[in-house]
Each structure stands twice: as C-alpha cells, then as structure tokens.
Amino acid sequence: MAVFHDEVEIEDFQYDEDSETYFYPCPCGDNFSITKEDLENGEDVATCPSCSLIIKVIYDKDQFMCGETVPAPSTNKELVKC
C-alpha cells in the first residue's frame, strides 16, 4: 500500500503542452510529474524523480478517457471449418 505525501487536484498542476506532462512542486525542490497518457490510462500517482515522495492526483477520469473507439463485434455468424 502506497503512502502518499499529499493529494492534489489536477487543476493545481502546471501543464506543459510540448511534453503533455503535468507538474507540481515537490518539497525537495524538484517537481512531481504525470503524463496526459498516464491519466488517460487511469493512473493517479505522480512521482518525483529526485526523491521517494509520491502524490495522489485527484481528477475526473471521464475527462481523460482516451479517444479510442472499440469496433462493434462482427455480426457475420458464418462458421469456418478447420
């Protein structure tokens, strides 16, 4: 079980459009970071690369759902013999 240093709303993070990464200041002087892709995949833990602290990111997962669509199953019911 992870012990979070803090829980922080995504709105409090700084967003870098070039790297598609969210940053939040860490007490050690570096930044916690989490990518947009991580959020789209349901991740909610931002890490600091300079120390062992982690924070829980509070965000609406529905807003970060990946835009991928899954095709409907085929309705072709023809069976193929092996």
Swiss-Prot record:
CC cofactor? Fe(2+)
Q: What does this protein do?
A: Required for the first step of diphthamide biosynthesis, a post-translational modification of histidine which occurs in elongation factor 2. DPH1 and DPH2 transfer a 3-amino-3-carboxypropyl (ACP) group from S-adenosyl-L-methionine (SAM) to a histidine residue, the reaction is assisted by a reduction system comprising DPH3 and a NADH-dependent reductase. Acts as an electron donor to reduce the Fe-S cluster in DPH1-DPH2 keeping the [4Fe-4S] clusters in the active and reduced state.
**Species annotation:** Cricetulus griseus (Chinese hamster)
Domain writeup: The DPH-type metal-binding (MB) domain can also bind zinc. However, iron is the physiological binding partner as zinc binding impairs the protein electron donor function.
The GO annotation for biological process reads:
negative regulation of protein secretion; positive regulation of binding; protein histidyl modification to diphthamide; tRNA wobble base 5-methoxycarbonylmethyl-2-thiouridinylation
Coiled-coil residue spans: none
- The DPH-type MB domain extends over 4-60
Reaction(s) this enzyme catalyzes, per UniProt: [3Fe-4S](1+)-[protein] + Fe(2+)-[Dph3] = [3Fe-4S](0)-[protein] + Fe(3+)-[Dph3]; 2 [3Fe-4S](0)-[protein] + 2 Fe(2+)-[Dph3] + NADH = 2 [4Fe-4S](1+)-[protein] + 2 [Dph3] + NAD(+) + H(+)
Q: Write the gene name.
A: DPH3
Task: Output the lineage of the source organism.
Answer: Eukaryota, Metazoa, Chordata, Craniata, Vertebrata
Q: What is this protein called?
A: Diphthamide biosynthesis protein 3
